[in-house]
Amino acid sequence: MLIDAGENNMGDDVLTFLDTLGLEKIDYAIATHPHSDHIGGLDTVMQEIPVGEVFFGPIPDKIVPTTKTFEDVLDVIEEKDIPLSTTTPGQTIDLGSGAVVTILGPVTEDIDDLNNTSVVCRLDFGETSFLFNGDQETPMEELLLQSGANLDCDMMTMGHHGSSTSSS
């Protein structure tokens, strides 16, 4: 599973890293949200490596981006006929070998900011858990806390790169 692929100029770096791991395909790619610093390299990756399915969080019509970056990603998804799915809280993705990803957020579709469409997910593998927060900001983090989602983890990414608008 690939979660995000960096800025527009990072696709080749992501491919180089995946090559060092010996990966020839990606079963699942999660695009946490459609800002270029998260999906910019995804089109390059999908052009070069088979991807089984791409996930985005729900994006309300009123804030669907019209950026070239987002359109490039959608174009490659269509060109390569890659299934595109919208995540829902509670959804699980079985990665095999005991690794399971659980989608935790966003917990509402009443969203006015693309950062808050960020997919939040928890990866459990054996006794270890990882929490990936995307760029959710404080109000959405508070809703996630109130939802009762299992946020207990051993390691986590800080929301919105650790900025003051997140990681409440």
Question: Where are the regions that the model predicts?
Answer:
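Non-globular, low-confidence helical/coil segments that flank catalytic cores
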Residues: 1-168
